[in-house]
Amino acid sequence: MDIDKNKRIGLTDEQVKQSREQHGRNVLTPPQRTSLWKLYLDKYRDPIIQILLVAAFVSLILAFIEKNFMETIGIFVAVFLATTVGFYFERDAAKKFNLLTALSEEQPVKVRRNGKVMEIPRHDVVVGDVVLVEVGDEVPADGELTLCNDLQINESTLTGEPVTEKSLEGGGDGAYPRNVILRSTMVMNGRGEFVVTAVGDATEIGKVAKKSTEQTSVETPLHMQLDKLAKMISKVGSVVSVAAFFIFLIHDILTNPAWGGKDYFYMAEIVLKYFMMAVTLIVMAVPEGLPMAITLSLALNMRRMLKSNNLVRKLHACETMGAVTVICTDKTGTLTQNKMQVSVLELKQGDEALLDIAIALNSTAELNDGKPIGNPTESALLLWLDAQGKDYEELRRQVNVLKQLPFSTERKMMATLAEVDGDTYLFVKGAPEIVMKKCVIEDRMLRQTAEELDEWQHKAMRTLAFAYKKIEASIMRTSRTSTAEVVALLDANDLQLQAIAAIADPIRPDVPAAVQECRHAGIEVKVVTGDTAATALEIGKQIGVFEDEPENIGADGSLTSLDQQMITGEQWEALSDDEAYERAKDIRVMSRARPTDKQRLVAMLQQRGEVVAVTGDGTNDAPALHYAHVGLSLGSGTSVAEEASDMTLLDDSFKSIANAVMWGRSLYRNLQRFLFFQLVVNVAALLLVLGGSVIGTEMPLTVTQILWVNLIMDTFAALALASLPPSHEVMKEKPRKASDFIINKSIGFGILFCGIVFFLVMFALLVYCERRGKGGVDVHELTMFFTTFVMIQFWNLFNAKALMSHHTAFRHFLKDRGMILVLVFVLVGQWIIVTFGGEMFRTTPLSLHEWLLIIGSTSVVLWAGELWRAFRRMITKRR
C-alpha cells in the first residue's frame, strides 16, 4: 500500500472491501454470555421460590399420606410458571438494555476515502483507513499518526495515564510509542490524522477483553429504596407466619384430644397443615414482584424514551429526571436548530483572497458533497465559501500550515500560522471582544464595528471576528513555530481586524412551548451559553425563560449592572461563594460562560437543595455533566461528553429534555400504582388467611390459589401498570423531593383503607358461609370465595390505573393495550382454573348466574372508585 498516497486520498471502495475481508469488522467480541439454562436455574435461587419448593415437598409427603397428588402438582406447576414468566421478562429487559451496545457501535467517525472526508459508523472502520480526530472524539481503532497538531490523548482506559502528549515521532517513555493512537482512548486537545493498523479484537483494548459498553446493572436509588421496603415487608410477613404457626399448633395441641393418642401420622399431618398455612402467609406477604416491576418499568421506559430521542445510558437517569427542579441548558443545537448560516460577512481590512484563506484554514470542519461534517459554526463558514464558488480544499492545498492553535472555550479563539505565496501570516478567528483586543483599530472603526456587532447580537445571531498579521521573515528564521511561539505572536496585540461575521441559528419552533411546560411543572430553566450578553438576552426572550424582562444591556453587549436574572461568566467568577449561593436561584441566563462557570452554578444549585439536569456537548462540559444529578449529552456532541453523561439527546432538542422529565415522572407514578395494588392485596390476603384460621375453617385460600393470585398481582399487574403510557398531566404538578419515600401518606392511607375494607367484606362472606353450612364451608363456597377475592383485585386494578388522578379509569382505556391484555388474561385464567382446576386448585365449576353475580357485585369496587374520582373532579372545578 502506498502510504503517502493513502494519506492523501484514503482507501477506495474496493480496498475497503478487501481490508474488511482480510482483517474483519471493527467490533469487539462481547464477553461470553451466561447460558440461558444457567440464567433460568438462577431463578430457583430466589428465597421465595425455595420456600415454595419446600412447601411442594411437604405437600408431596401429605399427598402420599392422603393419596391425593393434585395440589402438589399444582404447586410444582405454579413454581415452574412463576420462574419461567420471571425469566422471560428479565431476558426481555436485558435485550432492551443491550441496545446501548448496538448504538455505541453506530458512533460516527470521520474518515478520508476516495479523496473525500466522510462520516461512517465506527463498526465500518477498516485497517488502512485514514481517520480524522479532534477534541472530544473517542479513538475508534488502533493506528499510527500521520498528522499531529498539539494532540493530547487520555489513555487512562488502557495505561492509567490521564494525558499523553503525541507526536509523529515514535519512542518516548510511555507504555506505547508516541506516534501510536489506540481504540477507546479520548482526544483531550488538538487534532490529528492516523492510518488504522488494527480493528476489533486485534486492537489493544480488544486483546485485554475489556468491556467497552456502558454498565447497566447498577441499582438505582429507587431500586434500593424499594428493595428495603420489600425486605421490611418480608420480615413482617415471616414473623407473622412463624408466630401463627406456633400459636395455632399450640392451640391445637391444647384443644385436640388426638394429641393424647398414638396416631403419629395424624399428628404429623396436623403439623404439616399448619406449616403449609405458614408458607402460604409468607408467600402472600413477600412482594417478590417488586424487583421485576422496577426492572420491567425501567426497560420499557428506556425503549420508549429511545423512540422519543432519549438514549438512557445510566438507569438512575430514568427516575431522577422525574425529580429534576432545575435544567441548565446550552443554546446551540438544544434551543436552536443547529442549522447555522452566515447572514453577514463584512470585510474590514486586507484583500478578499486572504480572508478566504483565513476561513478555509481556521477550521476543522469538512464538506462531503455539500453536507457539513464537524463544528456547525465552522461548517457554516465553509458553506458560505462554497456559495461564493470557492473550493476550501483547494485553498488549503495552496498554503503550507506551519502551526495551528486549536479553539478552546478558555481562549475563545483559534489561530493558524501559514505560508501563503512565500509570505508567512498569522490568521485568527474567534469571539469579537477577544480578537478585537488583540488588534490595532482606529476609534471610528472600533465604534462602527461595535454598533454592527451589537445590532446582530440583539437579533440573536452568533458573531465572529477575523484578524491577521504578516510575520517578518527575520522572526520566522529564529522561530521553531511551537505553541508558545504562536501565543507570543498573539500576545503582541498588533493584529489587523480582517472581517466580522454574523451567523444565524433559528430557535427550534417547539422550544418555547417546551420551556413553558417545564416552568408550569415547577422546573426552572437556565440558559448557560458562551455567546455574548446581548445574544443570550435575545435567546432568553424568545424562549421565555425570564420572569420579567431584564434591562441595562450595554451597547458593547456587556452587562452594565448586576441584573438579578442575567450574569456573565466573568461576573459569576468574581462572586464569593456566599454571593454566588444567593444569586444562583435568580439567574436565568449566563452569557460568555466557561465550563468552570457551569460547574460552579450546578454546585451552588445543588447546595440549595435543587435536583439539577445539565446539557453539554463538548469535552470541557464533562465536569459539569459528572457533577449534575443528570448529565444530558447531545447526540452531535463529543464522545468525552457522552461518556460523562447519564442520558443522550439524540436529536439535541430541548423538547426531548421536557419529554424525559415527563417520562421520569410517569415512571414514578406507575411504580406507585403497582405498589398500591400489590400492597392492598398483601394486606387483605394476610388478614384473610389469619382470619380464616381464627374461626376454625380450612385455609380459605390454598397454596395453589395464593400462587395464582401472586402471579396476577406480581407479574401481570407489574406488566399492566408498568406499560401505561406517560401522561402530560404529570407536568402540571410540582417536582417531588428526591428524598421522598415512594409510598406517601395518601397512598399509605389508601393501602390500609382498601386492604382492611376488602378483608372485612371477604371475612364477612367467609363467616356467612361458615354459619350457613352445617358441616363448615364446602368446596363450592370456597370456590365462590376464591373467585370473589380475585375479582375484587381485578376491579381494583382499574383504581390503581387511575391512582392520584381525578380522571375516570376508562380514560384512554383502548390505548392501554398492555392493560387490556392483562385484564383479559386474568378473567380467562380465572375461568379456566375454576372450571378445570378441580382438586389441584380446590375448585368446582360455577354456573353462569354465579359468575355474573360475582362479577356484578365485586364491580362495586370500581364504581366506588369512580364516584370518589368524580367527587374530587367536582371539588377541583369549584376551586
Predicted regions and their residues:
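Alpha-helical transmembrane segments of multi-pass integral membrane proteins
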Residues: 749-765, 791
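Long hydrophobic segments that form regular secondary structure
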Residues: 767-768, 772-773, 777
